[in-house]
UniProtKB/Swiss-Prot annotation:
SUPFAM superfamilies: ATP synthase (F1-ATPase), gamma subunit. Keywords: ATP synthesis, Cell inner membrane, Cell membrane, CF(1), Hydrogen ion transport, Ion transport, Membrane, Transport. GO terms for cellular component: plasma membrane; proton-transporting ATP synthase complex. It is a peripheral membrane protein. One of its GO terms (molecular function) is proton-transporting ATP synthase activity, rotational mechanism. Belongs to the ATPase gamma chain family. Produces ATP from ADP in the presence of a proton gradient across the membrane. The gamma chain is believed to be important in regulating ATPase activity and the flow of protons through the CF(0) complex. This is ATP synthase gamma chain. F-type ATPases have 2 components, CF(1) - the catalytic core - and CF(0) - the membrane proton channel. CF(1) has five subunits: alpha(3), beta(3), gamma(1), delta(1), epsilon(1). CF(0) has three main subunits: a, b and c.
Length: 292
């Protein structure tokens, strides 16, 4: 049975752990506010850019002249970009993304496709480095402060790989931020580009645009930027999801520490009371023996 000193040592250790998790919760909350503001500012721009690309693509007579818009007749090579966090302590956040990626890669392999992985984030890269899948590239630090420059570097490389035939399709798995307590692992097809189509109700209310210069000239310039923007959007969403998941995990950990301290304190008091009772009984027993 644990001694009073052992129990007291455990209580002190749990209290120190609680202080650490509380501090990490506060740091995650501060980072979350900044990341969420950036995501919310960028999202309307990304949506409008997608709409422009859709309009331009509709006005082009021969979309086949654009490599980024043209599906391959036979898909044999798949590139997957997996976006995870660089650090842990965020619950099942990274695991959900990794599980989806592994299932996707295995499914494509079963179809006879050659699969390659670009790991954005240390956790995903570390996991697949120990597996049989080919990790073509690893990138870290992008979620600390997502930037257009970083997204463009990755996007240009993926576009080049697609144009020279090193991959027939490019997919991205990232965490879509739904709420403070819910983040959803999401699979997005990046290349070839297939702009989102408007619903019939949305089509009725939209205005017609006049484009200058021509649709073709604009598409040539804007299609690569569409890829960059989609990548940046996935980075923003995943960064916000990471901080929200870590804040929730640290809040739960702090709550668990408090409950454990209560339990240990109760155990400590019971053990101390039992010790005092035993000492009193020994004293009374000794006094009775002296009387005899």
């Amino acid at each position: 049975m644990a001694t009073l000193r052992d129990i007291k040592r455990k209580i002190d250790a749990v209290k120190k752990t609680s202080q650490i998790t509380k501090a990490m919760n506060m740091v995650a909350a501060a980072k979350l506010r900044g990341a969420q503001q950036n995501m919310e500012r960028f999202h309307p721009y990304a949506e409008k850019f997608n709409e422009v690309i859709e309009r331009l693509a509709e006005g082009v007579e021969d979309a086949g002249q654009y490599v980024l818009l043209t599906p391959r007749e036979e898909v044999k090579k798949i590139e997957l970009v997996l976006v995870t966090a660089d650090r842990g302590l965020c619950g099942s956040f990274n695991n959900n993304l990794i599980v989806m990626a592994e299932r996707f890669l295995k499914a494509k392999q079963a179809e006879g496709c050659q699969v390659r992985l670009t790991a954005v984030g240390r956790k995903g890269g570390d996991y697949f480095r120990r597996r049989t899948f080919e990790v073509r590239k690893r990138m870290t630090g992008l979620l600390n402060k997502p930037s257009y420059e970083d997204a463009a570097v990755l996007g240009r490389e993926l576009i080049e790989q697609f144009e020279i035939g090193e991959c027939d399709e490019v997919y991205v798995i990232y965490s879509r931020f739904l709420s403070m307590v819910r983040q959803q692992a999401t699979l997005m097809k990046l290349l070839p580009i297939a702009p989102a189509k408007k619903t019939e109700a949305e089509e009725k209310g939209r205005l017609e645009y006049l484009f200058e210069p021509s649709h073709e000239a604009l598409l040539t310039d804007l299609l690569p930027n569409y890829v960059f923007i989609e990548i940046l959007e996935s980075l923003y969403q995943t960064a916000v999801g990471e901080h929200a998941a870590r804040m929730a995990a640290m809040e739960n950990a702090t709550s668990n520490c408090k409950e454990l301290v209560k339990t240990l304190t109760l155990t400590y008091n019971k053990a101390r009371q039992a010790g005092i009772t035993k000492e009193l009984m020994d004293i009374v027993g000794g006094a009775e023996a002296l009387k005899k």
